[in-house]
Amino acid sequence: MSTTFCSSVSMQATSLAATTRISFQKPALVSRTNLSFNLSRSIPTRLSVSCAAKPETVEKVSKIVKKQLSLKDDQNVVAETKFADLGADSLDTVEIVMGLEEEFHIEMAEEKAQKITTVEEAAELIDELVQAKK
């Protein structure tokens, strides 16, 4: 075995593939004079990062959903609850969004509001909009 000093690290990415070359800047015991890995793989065109909403936001959204849909107090509405599973139609969903906007003093863009299907999605969007106002 021999000690090899390498000093380059590079990464090249395109919309369809990524090539990564890994080299070492510190002495490394290897049997070749250069150690590198070439990896080719597809890179997704979109990256989505989702963060859980604050528990207090989820709780408020649940209460508003119950109120807007005239649900009983003992009806279980949690983060994963889908509006459709509660019997909400598109008009009900619009009313839920209006109630949320009023309660949290925010305005939801129509295209984002139309994508909301669960309590969690509504709470995440609300947290995002409230944070953006600060």
Curated annotation (Swiss-Prot):
GO terms for molecular function: acyl carrier activity; phosphopantetheine binding. One of its GO terms (cellular component) is chloroplast. The modification O-(pantetheine 4'-phosphoryl)serine is found at residue 90. The keyword RNA-binding does not apply. Residues 1-51 form a transit peptide. It comes from the Eukaryota. Seed. In rape seeds ACP is coded by two multigene families. There are probably a total of 35 genes. This is Acyl carrier protein, chloroplastic. It comes from Brassica napus (Rape). The gene is ACL1.A1.
